[in-house]
């Protein structure tokens, strides 16, 4: 939680490790992103125009949502797209393994917003990029843990060929 303290002290968004979304997110992605955000704020009891409360809710990312374990995934900055896929598959394997042991996980891309703080606090070399964080622990009785985001039908994003 040293990172969360440092982030709150700075109270600014650091240099991004990478751009997660385009600056101008197009449809249908922007509507989907907003729908999940609004649903989450509703579970928290936060009104859409309550920006301080929305920010405070977002900052819970940087406390790993109170989970007892926080994991960072990183790799050499020079590696390309295929290696990002490898990290994602590795993360998924950890998530499946954790679930099999009765643990819950939450992958957290939000850490890309504070890469330099993570680097400094954890003494991570600049040659490495922070890909993601992940919270891990036993499920808590928390409003956000009841959120089930809407999924588009399989045939809208997949083509099966035989």
Enumerate the predicted regions with their spans.
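Short, charged/polar surface micro-motifs in flexible loops or helix N-caps
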Residues: 5-6, 77-78, 140
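Alpha-helix-centered segments that form part of catalytic cores
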Residues: 26-73
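Single conserved hydrophobic/aromatic residue that forms the stacking wall/gate
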Residues: 1-12
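Glycine-rich, charged/polar anion/phosphate-binding loops
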Residues: 55-58, 118-121, 143
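Short proline/glycine-enriched turn/loop segments at secondary-structure junctions
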Residues: 119-126, 146-148
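C-terminal helix-cap and adjacent tail motif
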Residues: 13, 17, 22-32, 129-162
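Small-aliphatic-rich amphipathic alpha-helix that forms the alpha element of a beta-alpha
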Residues: 67-121
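Short coil/turn connectors at secondary-structure junctions
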Residues: 66-68, 126-130
